[in-house]
Amino acid sequence: MAEQISSAKAEARTVRIAPRKARLVVDLIRGKSVAEALAILEFTPRAASPIVEKVLRSAIANAEHNYDLESANLYVSEAYVNEGATLKRFRPRAKGMASPINKRTSHVVVVVSEKND
């Protein structure tokens, strides 16, 4: 007999935001209900907030569409940010020198699960 799937996952890979900055936002929503998490993200003035919100909405849509889960019963069971590829650039400086610039990217992952009441 097949086991009932009770979680759904969404990822955004190679997003142009530093992982350190994205983790600040992701830490706010971990363990919260999806309604509360969306409210938090809507009013958090960080560049990563819209990115994480989009991934969360995608995870909710995956849960509803693919696994027939009720969005009212969902919470953010996992949310983490891994480091993606780094774009390496150089900034010209005085006397013919150059300084390196690392444009960091992130892989944002959000997993939503059903509450076991």
UniProtKB/Swiss-Prot annotation:
InterPro entries: Ribosomal_uL22, Ribosomal_uL22_bac/chlpt-type, Ribosomal_uL22_bac/org-type, Ribosomal_uL22_sf. It holds the Pfam family Ribosomal_L22. Keywords: Ribonucleoprotein, Ribosomal protein, RNA-binding, rRNA-binding. GO terms for molecular function: rRNA binding; structural constituent of ribosome. One of its GO terms (cellular component) is cytosolic large ribosomal subunit. The keyword Chaperone does not apply. GO terms for biological process: translation. PANTHER family: CHLOROPLAST 50S RIBOSOMAL PROTEIN L22-RELATED, LARGE RIBOSOMAL SUBUNIT PROTEIN UL22M. This protein binds specifically to 23S rRNA; its binding is stimulated by other ribosomal proteins, e.g. L4, L17, and L20. It is important during the early stages of 50S assembly. It makes multiple contacts with different domains of the 23S rRNA in the assembled 50S subunit and ribosome. The globular domain of the protein is located near the polypeptide exit tunnel on the outside of the subunit, while an extended beta-hairpin is found that lines the wall of the exit tunnel in the center of the 70S ribosome. Part of the 50S ribosomal subunit. Belongs to the universal ribosomal protein uL22 family. This is Large ribosomal subunit protein uL22.
